[in-house]
Amino acid sequence: MNEQDPILQLLVSTRAGGGPQHVLTVALGLQRRGWRFVVAGPGDGPMVEQFRAAGVDVVPLPTDRLTPLTLLRLVRLIRARKVRLVHSHGKGAGLYGRLAARLAHVPAVHTFHGLHYERYPGPARALYLALERRLSRITRVVVNVSRAQEREGLSLELFTSGQSRVVLNGVDVARLAGSALERRDARAALGLDLAEAVVGCAARFDEVKRLDVLVRAAALSPGFALVLIGDGPEGARLRRLAAELGVARRLRVAGEVPEAARLFPAFDVFASAARKEGLPLAVVEAMALGLAVVASDIPAHREVLGAPCEGLVDGTAGAFAARLSSVLADAGLRARLGAENRTRARSELDARTMLAALEGLYGEILGL
């Protein structure tokens, strides 16, 4: 092994989303400092081309399906590319990555991008938690993307305090600002009028994101258009709900957009009604771009926005409708919240802090 041997970043998805975007930021930042990476994951997502454009070697691997052949292919990949460390992201990738690292005799790091176990019925939940506890025994370090997540994981005994490192997900503020469209262009891309009030959200269309709350809030407060950027299993249900509530004309579903934050300048307010998050990267991106944010009062949102915060609400459609209406009606309040968010993102959630922490972690594990 030498210092030019790569680190493998293993993903369970290459769709546009927080995990793949995080890995892209890490690869872009640490390659400039001399690190080499291989990214492996499903080959059908739009982020694949983003990685390749960044000069990252991408190997298609169906980590979103459980098969012994995938594990065998992963072990062969680690050996063929002389991978010196495996860093996995997400459930399926965490299973494959840690088992393959063990078989190939290289250290394993795993990042939890949220602890989403509640959706499983009782027996399946117990089985999943038991599996994570066993996998922790062959994991050198567990990275938690927020302090709230670390506390929850420790309470569930998914890892030990000695294994855990908290590395807050950060965004490349300068790159984000440079790639964002002007307000006029962003609105044109989304088919929005310059004069209308716009609330936006970018998320996977999954039940845990509770995008239905935002649709219901739009029905309760007729003064704004709602833009949802993303895709997922809840898409059809959200469209039906909008039609039932009479807000289909005010709903824009933009679909899956790589680097969706480029379009955030189209929004007057960014909203997140998620029931649970690891660390909400899209919220951090909105903050970095100086947007006011209205979000459900959950630990991850409190951690990134700061608490107390005027943008936090109790998570009901009525609470969202009321707060969104008040923020949209007050340009001074929007400007102040946006400025506070930008300052907080740049001081506490900039990618440079995250990259330094991960570089230190990799160096420590590899004895560099």
Task: Please name every model-derived segment.
Residues 256, 275:
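Aromatic "clamp/platform" in nucleotide-sugar-dependent glycosyltransferases that forms part
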Residues 177-192, 333, 342:
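A short helix/loop element that forms part of the nucleotide-sugar donor recognition site in Leloir-type
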Residues 239-255:
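Nucleotide-activated donor-binding/catalytic signature segment of Leloir-type glycosyltransferases, i.e.
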Residues 40-41, 292-295:
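Short hydrophobic beta-strand element within catalytic cores of glycosyltransferases
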Residues 9-69, 149-153, 157, 233:
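N-terminal strand-loop element at the rim of the active site
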Residues 306-318, 326-332:
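Conserved acidic donor-binding segment of nucleotide-sugar-dependent glycosyltransferases
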Residues 17-28, 197, 201-220, 233-240:
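A conserved mid-protein helix/loop that constitutes part of the nucleotide-sugar donor-binding site
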Residues 138-165, 171-175:
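A short, active-site helix/loop in glycosyltransferases that binds the activated sugar's phosphate group
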